């Protein structure tokens, strides 16, 4: 099975989005570093859905780039279901321009970042953030992309 992706495109305009193969590649280069098999959903949404979900689940009154919803496996059950990633197209596109990053690289970074959240990583505390950013950089560079945090380090 390896990494099984359910890609949902819930946007008005699908033109210019990464391909399903892109999303699969990014997952295949991330999740097997931590576990051999997984199932997850990536849902690409517009700003309205992102805003509603971010408000409902995080209390933030704005859209966000990526939301992660890890699946909590009931005790005593064996399942490979990791959870869901909700990625907002407009926020990703806007951030790529603001951060002067290639759009495809920023999409890849959002998938890597969200996947690490599903795997239990976080960036609330400084030491956690440092570990997570280091992993993201290593994974992104392993796929041939630049350090996604290079602008912050300069």
Swiss-Prot record:
What processes in GO biological process is this protein linked to? rRNA processing
Provide the organism lineage as a comma list: Bacteria, Pseudomonadati, Pseudomonadota, Gammaproteobacteria, Vibrionales
Which purpose does this protein serve, as stated in its record? Single strand-specific metallo-endoribonuclease involved in late-stage 70S ribosome quality control and in maturation of the 3' terminus of the 16S rRNA.
Q: What gene name is listed for this protein?
A: ybeY
Q: Which cofactor does it need?
A: Zn(2+)
From what organism does this protein derive? Vibrio campbellii (strain ATCC BAA-1116)
Asked if the Swiss-Prot or TrEMBL record annotates the protein with the keyword Nuclease, the reply is: yes
Q: Give me the residues that bind Zn(2+), please.
A: 113, 117, 123
Against Pfam families, the record matches this protein to:
YbeY
Q: How is the cofactor bound?
A: Binds 1 zinc ion.
Question: What are the alphabetically sorted keywords of the record?
Answer: Cytoplasm, Endonuclease, Hydrolase, Metal-binding, Nuclease, Ribosome biogenesis, rRNA processing, Zinc
Cysteine disulfide links: none
What EC designation does it have?
3.1.-.-
Annotated protein name in UniProt? Endoribonuclease YbeY
**Which NCBIfam families does the record cross-reference, listed alphabetically?**
rRNA maturation RNase YbeY (TIGR00043)
Q: Which family does it belong to?
A: Belongs to the endoribonuclease YbeY family.
Cell compartments where the protein resides:
Cytoplasm
Under the GO molecular function aspect, what terms does this record hold? Answer: metalloendopeptidase activity; RNA endonuclease activity; zinc ion binding
PANTHER family, per the entry: ENDORIBONUCLEASE YBEY, CHLOROPLASTIC (PTHR46986:SF1)
Q: Which Gene Ontology terms of cellular component type are present?
A: cytoplasm
